[in-house]
Amino acid sequence: MALAHILGYPRIGANRELKKAVEAYWKGDIDQAELERRGQALRAEHWQASRDAGLDFVTVGDFAFYDQVLNVSAMLGAVPPRFGAIDGDVDLDTTFRMARGRAPSGTPAAACEMTKYFDTNYHYLVPELHAGQRFRVASTRLFDEVAEAQAAGHPVKVALLGPVSWLWLGKEKSAGLDRLTLLDDVLSVYGEILERLAAQGVEWVQLDEPALVQDLPRDWRQAFESAYNKLQSAPVKLLLATYFGALGDNLGLAAGLPVAGLHIDTVRAPEQLDAVLDRLPTYKVLSLGAIDGRNIWRADLAALRERLQVARARLGERLWISASCSLLHVPVDLDAETDLDAELKSWLAFARQKLDEIVTLAHLLDGRATPEDTARLEAATSALDARRQSPRIHKPAVGERLAAVSADDAERASPYATRAKAQHRHLDLPLFPTTTIGSFPQTQDIRAARRAFKSGELSRDDYEARMRDEIAHAVERQEALAIDVPVHGEPERNDMVEYFGELLDGFAFTRFGWVQSYGSRCVKPPVIFGDVSRPGPMTVRWSEYAQSLTDKPMKGMLTGPVTILQWSFVRDDQPRDATCRQIALSLRDEVADLEAAGIKIIQIDEPALREGLPLRQGEWQEYLDWAVKSFKLSAAVARDETQIHTHMCYSEFNDIIAAIAALDADVITIETSRSDMELLDAFQDFAYPNEIGPGVYDIHSPNIPEVEWMVSLMEKAAEKIPAERLWVNPDCGLKTRGWAEVEPALANMVEAARELRRRYG
């Protein structure tokens, strides 16, 4: 009998209950006991959903109040000294301090670095690793949650990030440290954790090792062998979980490790199934990630049943069926989407529906389909046939325009050196010009107005009048602060991707399709279901109005084609690069319209450019080629004197600096404050020719940056980049902060720029 299970479930709740609870706790509106009670209620609800669907286990360990990697760091006692907790238990407040930047005394402390989890839009807190670091079992949270599930009568499988991938995701904080020298001590704690889980009666523990789908140096491959040879004595069965891609040259390594089972991703890498079947020892379970854990399209159950029959025949009782990865990356429940049109809704499956798909597929492969399974199979086949034939998908005019694009369409009229001279004459900005990344605080009043407008309580005219008031306020505050290049603040935008998707054809929107980005931050990705085109201008009137309020050059704000693609649920019936070029052409028209409206600076944000990189370096160039061409296609229509900015956050640039330069943006703003300007090394080594705004303060922390601290960061930047090519700006947009934090932070930033002009002018 094929067993059905999942690697993890969304923890935010169908109505973002987790976000609301955590933020209420941070504000002091609820106490920790109430926060824990709400977390327990969410876990109970999610475990019950698994049982109701018919899964053979509930998965325990996928829940976190902030981040599952942070949970492991806390469990291992891997807390940076500035946050205390050197001995004893690591409590919830300590983990929040690590994430948000506070010392135990309440004074500001640098938050732990945050970066993308492999190639997803989920962000994790990077473990900080030090020479001589001591590890211990420092949290009982996992054991407590196991006891919770058992008390509710659930059969438990524990999910935990594996020891090697935890180290792989970490960062050395001691000069000359090799992370792998810490592995033995980490393994000792993992061994103790597994012993304690066994004592609780846990039979299966899933250890996530997604590092195995990447290019691993020899010493890391050896580390996997060493680690799992040591862990094989643990009195539990280990399921080694790999996902986000193919095992590739690590297949033999993964198949040969002394564990009881292996999970592979057969959505991202269906081609690896036959090779894994050939290499898997006859005693091991093989868990097939056959249902897409990262996208929302309904599974083709008939095709999967046919394709996986060979695995069923060869494995028999050793076959498990699952999603490709944790369902963390998809929304919770499609049933909540009562406003979505019936045809489009029939093409989709969210996390709750994917539980049903997993169970039905297992039943179909076993030949034990229930009437409900048969009905589900027939409904899926019918919906997918309708999707393939729907006239909503393909628009001939879009295809014709795309086919007519030439190489010249992606090139600016003049090289950067020529453009820079024209822009400096046109803009007349000071040394170290100041700007922000685009968004200003989304206040309760703004959110209330948007809700009232969407519910019909507020007319369009009244809503737009309120948004103009908010724009005027943002411009007024920037004028008072003496920001050199203001922005309109984006009060009219609910989300930097969703806003554009609502104004483009080929997109659809959900009401409850939230997924976790980091901590309490959730995003609601648009659904790209068909060909993309722009019916009309999207941002022009807002930027034009903002420009009318100031003599300074107002910066127009667009989200780039690659980021719109990466942060959407993308159609799976054509190559991603084709969809990206369709978006780029729509943005190209917007750039032309902004320029015609008198906007002299246009920012095309691409924070997700690096995120789209394949996990295997051998596949990078193909992706970078089309990603860069898409960006340039959107920007190249601009005249020489129009300055094109781009912004990238949470990015590492060393290995893609040539592609960054190939974007040919006049100014690039990047997140650097958490990395102490280390990211600029890549630009220095590459002799990057254009202008750069290295972020001088971390907007994810509520701390107010000091003037001298920002000056010192910019002085480090000026050692690597000529002062005349440096801008002064925050790391990222200010949407999630409050005005009480933003104004003093920006005032200090402007003062830092003045001091820099005194020193370098």
Curated annotation (Swiss-Prot):
Reactions accelerated catalytically: 5-methyltetrahydropteroyltri-L-glutamate + L-homocysteine = tetrahydropteroyltri-L-glutamate + L-methionine
GO terms for biological process, alphabetical: methionine biosynthetic process; methylation
Binding-site list for L-homocysteine: 437-439, 490, 605
UniProtKB keywords: Amino-acid biosynthesis, Metal-binding, Methionine biosynthesis, Methyltransferase, Repeat, Transferase, Zinc
SUPFAM superfamilies: UROD/MetE-like (SSF51726)
Enzyme nomenclature, EC number: 2.1.1.14
Family, similarity comment: Belongs to the vitamin-B12 independent methionine synthase family.
Function of the protein: Catalyzes the transfer of a methyl group from 5-methyltetrahydrofolate to homocysteine resulting in methionine formation.
HAMAP family associated with the record: Meth_synth
UniProt protein name: 5-methyltetrahydropteroyltriglutamate--homocysteine methyltransferase
Source organism (scientific name): Chromohalobacter salexigens (strain ATCC BAA-138 / DSM 3043 / CIP 106854 / NCIMB 13768 / 1H11)
Name of encoding gene: metE
